[in-house]
């Protein structure tokens, strides 16, 4: 190998190691990147803010069949949560004492139809999607409904229903989104 190629290879290795260290340091400091359509794509920072309506959150899905199927079908990734699920990012759109109803036209919270919330009957491969069944359910103290308000095709609460607050790992705040 020529001297120039050795220098180029060394430079590439050094740049790669530096990029990995920078990414690991950013993650340890609280940086999170969203590449899904469930919330705006971009860079987020973890926060100690309370979980409340309107907040973006990072959560581990509970070990339920609906999430096993979602992982198997590729709706959610593999990761380090129980059940081998990856973290998910959504927005809290309903919390304690909110009445939630799911119908063909979408999800209603306290009677108001959420935008982009109509359940889809089948995925792109033609497989039937699950659907949370509720004509009206009032969320308890420890329950939240996590949804997308920017995508009509997000795998969210319209399919899996409310989750327990204990599944939420942190609130995340947008830094740069596009």
Swiss-Prot record:
GO cellular component: periplasmic space
Keyword Chloroplast: no
One GO BP: signal peptide processing
SUPFAM superfamilies linked to this entry: LexA/Signal peptidase
Main location: periplasm
Gene Ontology MF terms: serine-type endopeptidase activity
Subcellular location: Periplasm
Signal peptide range in chain numbering: 1-30
Keywords annotated in UniProt: Conjugation, Periplasm, Plasmid, Signal
Signal is among the record's keywords: yes
NCBIfam families for the chain: PRK13884.1 (NF010459), TraF_Ti (TIGR02771)
Family: Belongs to the peptidase S26C family.
Known function: Required for donor-specific phage sensitivity. May be involved in pilus assembly.
UniProt name for this protein: Plasmid transfer protein TraF
Gene from which the chain derives: traF
């Amino acid at each position: 190998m020529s001297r120039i190629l050795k220098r180029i290879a060394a430079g590439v290795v050094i740049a790669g190691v530096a990029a990995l260290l920078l990414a690991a340091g950013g993650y340890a400091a609280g940086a999170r990147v969203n590449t899904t359509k469930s919330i705006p794509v971009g860079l987020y920072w973890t926060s100690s803010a309370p979980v409340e309506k309107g907040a973006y959150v990072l959560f581990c899905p509970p070990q339920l069949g609906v999430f096993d199927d979602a992982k198997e079908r590729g709706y959610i990734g593999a990761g380090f949560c129980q059940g081998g699920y990856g973290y998910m990012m959504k927005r809290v759109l309903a919390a304690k004492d909110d009445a939630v109803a799911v119908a063909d036209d979408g999800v209603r919270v306290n009677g108001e139809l959420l935008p982009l919330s109509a359940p889809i009957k089948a995925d792109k491969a033609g497989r039937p999607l699950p659907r949370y069944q509720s004509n009206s359910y009032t969320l308890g103290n420890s329950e939240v409904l996590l949804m997308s308000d920017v995508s009509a095709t997000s795998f969210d609460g319209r399919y899996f229903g409310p989750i327990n607050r204990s599944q939420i790992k942190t609130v995340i705040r947008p830094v740069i989104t596009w």
